[in-house]
């Protein structure tokens, strides 16, 4: 049975990495958590770069009709900045342990 060794840990990515390392097991993790995580022992990335693993982030201002406490003007300003050339540059330059964490692709 393929799922015989499957474990659902019900925790965040950092805790999941800790459990996988403690069990000497495999897990799927996002790159930024993997890079930021300090206790990797001898574990390493064994597979990466396949398009189905692409973990894209998006930004969507929330409608004040649905969420009355939303600050729409501020949300639009943040969205526009993140999608701007300067925002995309800042995202691309954000690094941890000398590794780029995010790869902006706004069009």
Predicted regions and their residues:
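Exported/periplasmic ABC-transporter solute-binding proteins
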Residues: 1-107
